[in-house]
Amino acid sequence: MSDSAGGRAGLRRYPKLPVWVVEDHQEVLPFIYRAIGSKHLPASNISFLHFDSHPDLLIPVNMPADTVFDKETLFGELSIENWIMPAVYAGHFSHVIWFHPAWAQQIREGRHHFLVGKDTSTTTIRVTSTDHYFLSDGLYVPEDQLENQKPLQLDVIMVKPYKLCNNQEENDAVSSAKKPKLALEDSRNTASTNCDSSSEGLEKDTATQRSDQTCLEASCSCSSENQECQTAASTGEILETLKKGKAFVLDIDLDFFSVKNPFKEMFTQEEYKILQELYQFKKPGTNLTEEDLVDIVDTRIHQLEDLEATFADLCDGDDEETVQRWASNPGMESLVPLVQSLKKRMEVPDYEMVHQAGLTCDYSELPHHISTEQEIEYLIQSVHYLLKNLPNPTLVTIARSSLDDYCPSDQVDTIQEKVLNMLRALYGNLDLQVYAAESPPS
């Protein structure tokens, strides 16, 4: 856990590790910008370690790219799902590692290299990645359509909970006095069909080599130009990458440990099924040309724009004639039973919320896994064993994500305390700042 050398020369150091706790995840960004302004973080080449059940790597669809250079305006434009990429385009983050639990599979496992830049035709932020995560939101553009390009290395790595070697009948709780053995679990290959990926433990740094291993899914290396993948990544490789960078931020969403899909409780099973039909994104095949990809994105953008217009119109009036008019469009037939069902359950349906829920129903559902106490403890230990072999972060940001019901409200306080205790065990005394019920600084 020693500080990396060289790259951090010239940066100021905090006396104690600052830990910022917020409610909504985008609220951590002002603290990161504050650290850049105070010279505790560099203005560029920051590595960002992101433990979360959601990637948060979307982009405000209609936000002008230059908004990133006006931080006050920027902070007001961001939401929980799209706050990281603007910091990439601004030049601050060059390397993002998304550590995710087994139940979160939104982005193809492995190492991705792509560009983030300004779309010359729309002046918005777009990417060259062809992963379904970006295609389904209409965010892909060809490289020659981007200006002010910023390269991004994105590593997507699964963290699996360890299993105690002890007999659990004799050990109802994890004992801090006993050192758990981290055992690798067999897992299905979560990479794309043309990725060779295997399950293997990430190697520890040679200076701290142990017989126990952190449970991480081996990753594969992918790029938008070449979709061939090679098995890669070890804690040693992560360590070397962090040493090359100037500094890194450790970011933890408490829903990493236990997560809900709040929309599943807002809608009936049949309503949710209809939303999936209306908003579905059919995964494209492989070996697509640039022209194919552009056509796919254009079609998807038109689909989403039509759906947005539909539900915006229904906000003004959901009489039968209006519903039938929209339902007459291709692929919109199921709008009629959806509206009928909503109106039976509520006097005035919130069609804006219906549209927001629909946007999450593209090629996969939002992750939903309410963890047991034991599962939470196992994940805490896996994260602990990963972090103990990495350099110290410059700062830590934590999002509770409970008011919007992503992290279960009856578990969030317990998870937060476990995470803070883990951080204290790793880094000693913390400079803890809790802003969960307040507005973050500007």
From Swiss-Prot:
Pfam families: UPF0489
Transmembrane segments: none
InterPro entries noted in UniProt: UPF0489
Segments of this protein annotated with the region Disordered: 175-208
Biased composition regions of type Polar residues, renumbered to the chain: 189-200
Assigned protein family: Belongs to the UPF0489 family.
Name of the protein in its database record: UPF0489 protein C5orf22 homolog
Lineage: Eukaryota, Metazoa, Chordata, Craniata, Vertebrata
